[in-house]
Structure formats: structure tokens, C-alpha cells
A protein has these predicted regions:
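Paired small-residue
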Residues: 81, 85-88, 96-105, 291-299
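Helix-loop-helix hairpin linking two adjacent transmembrane segments in secondary transporters
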Residues: 97, 126-180, 222
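Extracytoplasmic gate region of multi-pass secondary transporters
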Residues: 203-243
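Helix-breaking motifs and short loop linkers at transmembrane-helix boundaries and internal kinks
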Residues: 38, 70, 91-97, 232, ...
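Conserved MFS/SLC helix-loop-helix module at the cytosolic interface between two early adjacent transmembrane helices
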Residues: 57-96
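Helix-to-loop junctions at the C-terminal end of transmembrane segments
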Residues: 59-70, 252-265, 349
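Cytoplasmic helix-loop-helix junction between adjacent transmembrane helices
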Residues: 95, 101-139
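C-terminal transmembrane helical hairpin of 12-TM major facilitator-type secondary transporters
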Residues: 266-311
């Protein structure tokens, strides 16, 4: 049993690492792709846009159907489609086919990422659910600081197309591994009607994630530009700063599991939001303080992603019969928050400058805390009236 659990965690971790690499590796490759297809950088940016929009739309569907039909088969399907889409990206004869390939990739990842979270929540022991989730989440976050640089290195020696070939081959191997790993996991057989109230409650719950994403990505999307503008950082210093952030995110996810299992999902998810708001104020005050910026970015990511992981565990605990659709909507909420955060960041920069970004993020963290606390009160009221369930 212990051995099977380790295998499941490893397969989940490496699968999410691949999904994260596919997400994070595209942006650094856009200049090379733009040059090869002779299109503007703005046009190549649509590779990212169509991926995220497709993911956000498709993820709730796969979450809903996996709650009824089982998750393993859809994860396997997603990985096969992932392999096909990345092969198509690698060998696209035109820019139109390249865009189509990224739409298919977004559809594939929508069938994989949220369902991995959900199936880990299904099989994890109740007293270890936070730890198990934190481990697989760290796979996705490791791609932030390891997967993308490895891909960029491959581009240097073999060209950008080679990266997608490698991901296509890896996806095929993981399709086999995931099929064998999850084929014994029983279907959840959820029969609840989400239309009558439950879906609205789920959307209300994942709105916390949307505001959390705003508190993280309003600054992170423009971090490199902010460090250059405010601190005159070199490319190497910016890369070092992003590495500190990425390592903090991975460690935050991992330690979150231990604290969540010990103190509970609600306490940790709320405490991290308050702490993050304070850290962001400090980040704003000391953004141009030299080497302190590395430490503050590390702590910000550590606390922020500890909160994200604990809140995922909280959602899984609160919606045991709808884990697939909850994780899917939570991931959709995350992408919506990233999009809104980037828009808010652009507005703040154009009106007040980069130095105001940390304070806007801090305000978003406070709003997320208020929503999270309100969610706790609603849960307590529901527990007091079990007949309504």
C-alpha cells in the first residue's frame, strides 16, 4: 500500500512537471518562433492566449464528467492528445496550424492537471491529504524554475522544435504510466445535481483562488520589467531573482502539506493570506533595497504557494463528492485571476508605476482573506443544518 502510494505520487508529480513545462516554456521561445514564421511578437503571443482560454473553458467539463465516469481514462486521453498536439506544434507547416496545435494542447492539459489533483485527493489517506497534494503541486511549480530553463537550453543546441518533440515523446510514455497507475481507482459515482445550488457554492469557493492569483500575478507578470526599471537589474540578476521566487514556491508547496495535516486546511489557508499581505507591504517598501529583494521574493512565493496548496486541500475536504469539478473550476479560477492580474498590473504601471504593484497585490491578498473567512462561516452554517445537504 505504501509502495503503491509512492508510485502514484511519483507519476502525479512527473505528469504535472511536464504540464508545467509545457505552460512555462512557451514564453521564452516566442522570439524564435516569431522569427521562423515571420510574424510579429504580438501574433506569437496568441499561442499562450489560445492555450489558456481553451484550458479555462474545457477544465470544468472534464472535471464534471470525471466525477461521473472516472478520472484515469480522461487523464490517459489527455496525455495522448497532449503528445499529438506537441508533435503538431513541432512540425506545424504554418502559423495557423501552430495556433491550432496550442488550442489542442490547452484542451489536453484541461483533461490532465485538475484531474491529477482530484485523483490524488481521492486516494490519499484523509490525515495525509495535504502532504500528498503538496507533493504533486510541487511538480508543477518545479517546472517554473527548472523545466523552462531546461527547455531554453535545448533550444540553444537543437532548436525550439526539439522541445516539443521531447514533450510529445514524454507524454506518450506518461500516458501508459498513468493508465496503469489509475486503472484500479474506483469511480466516484457522484449523482448530486450541481445545478441546484451546489455549482454556485463551488464558484463562490474558488473565487478565493481568483483573488489569490491576482495578489500573486499582478506583480509577477511584470517582475522582470519592474526589477529592471526600479533596480536596473541585469539579465543575470533578474534570472536569479526569478529562481529565488521559484524555489520559494516549491518549498512553500511542500511544507504546506505538513502544516495543513497538523493544523487543518482552514487555519493554514487563512493565516498565509494575512502573512502574505504583510510580506507584500514589506516588498513594496524595500523593493529597491539591493540584495534584500531576493529574500523577500523567496518568502513571498513560499507563503503564497503554501496558501494555494492548503486551499486546494480545503476544497477537496469540503467537496468530497465533487472533487473533479471543484479542482477544474479552481484551475479555471486561477487562470482567470492570472489574466485579471496582468490587466490590473498594466493599468497600475501606466498610471502610477511599478513601485505600486506590491501594494495592490497586498490589497488583493486581504480581499482574498475576507472571502476565505466568509467561506468558513458559510461552512459552519451548513454543518449546523445537515438536512439541507
Amino acid at each position: 500500500m505504501v509502495s503503491q502510494g509512492r508510485v502514484s505520487l511519483f507519476v502525479g508529480w512527473i505528469t504535472l512537471f511536464l504540464m508545467g513545462t509545457d505552460l512555462f516554456v512557451v514564453s521564452p521561445l516566442l522570439p524564435f518562433i516569431s522569427e521562423e514564421y515571420d510574424v510579429s511578437p504580438v501574433m506569437t503571443g496568441w499561442m499562450v492566449t489560445v492555450f489558456t482560454v481553451t484550458y479555462a473553458i474545457a477544465a470544468p467539463f472534464f472535471g464534471w464528467v470525471s466525477d461521473k465516469k472516472g478520472r484515469g481514462i480522461f487523464i490517459t486521453f489527455g496525455l495522448l492528445l497532449f503528445s499529438f498536439s506537441n508533435a503538431l506544434t513541432a512540425f506545424s507547416p504554418s502559423f495557423t496550424w501552430l495556433i491550432i496545435s496550442r488550442i489542442l494542447a490547452g484542451l489536453a492539459v484541461a483533461a490532465i492537471t485538475p484531474l491529477i489533483y482530484a485523483i490524488i485527493g481521492d486516494i490519499a489517506p484523509s490525515n495525509r491529504r495535504g502532504t500528498w497534494l503538496s507533493i504533486v503541486v510541487s511538480g508543477h511549480l518545479t517546472a517554473l524554475w527548472a523545466g523552462a530553463p531546461i527547455g531554453t537550453l535545448l533550444e540553444l543546441f537543437l532548436g525550439w522544435r526539439s522541445i516539443f518533440v521531447v514533450m510529445a515523446i514524454t507524454g506518450t510514455l506518461l500516458a501508459v504510466a498513468n493508465f496503469k497507475t489509475w486503472k484500479g481507482v474506483p469511480e466516484s459515482n457522484s449523482t448530486r445535481n450541481l445545478i441546484e445550488g451546489k455549482l454556485l457554492r463551488i464558484i463562490g469557493s474558488v473565487s478565493v483562488t481568483t483573488i489569490w492569483a491576482i495578489s500573486m500575478y499582478t506583480l509577477y507578470v511584470y517582475l522582470g520589467a519592474a526589477l529592471y526599471s526600479e533596480n536596473r537589474f541585469t539579465s543575470l540578476e533578474i534570472a536569479l531573482a526569478v529562481s529565488f521566487y521559484g524555489i520559494g514556491a516549491v518549498l512553500g508547496s511542500l511544507i504546506s502539506g505538513q502544516f495543513t495535516d497538523r493544523f487543518g486546511e482552514k487555519k493554514i489557508s487563512k493565516a498565509t493570506l494575512i502573512l502574505m499581505a504583510l510580506i507584500l507591504v514589506c516588498l513594496g517598501m524595500f523593493f529597491s533595497s539591493g540584495d534584500w529583494i531576493y529574500f523577500l521574493l523567496f518568502i513571498w512565493a513560499l507563503v503564497g504557494y503554501a496558501g494555494f496548496t492548503s486551499y486546494q486541500a480545503r476544497l477537496i475536504a469540503e467537496y468530497p463528492k465533487e472533487r473533479g469539478i471543484v479542482m477544474a473550476w479552481n484551475n479555471t479560477a486561477l487562470y482567470i485571476g492570472i489574466t485579471i492580474g496582468s490587466m490590473i498590473g498594466a493599468y497600475v504601471i501606466s498610471n502610477w508605476g511599478y513601485s505600486f504593484l506590491p501594494y495592490v497585490c497586498s490589497l488583493a491578498a486581504i480581499i482574498s482573506f475576507v472571502l476565505s473567512a466568509q467561506k468558513v462561516q458559510e461552512t459552519k452554517k451548513e454543518s449546523a443544518f445537515p438536512a439541507d445537504r
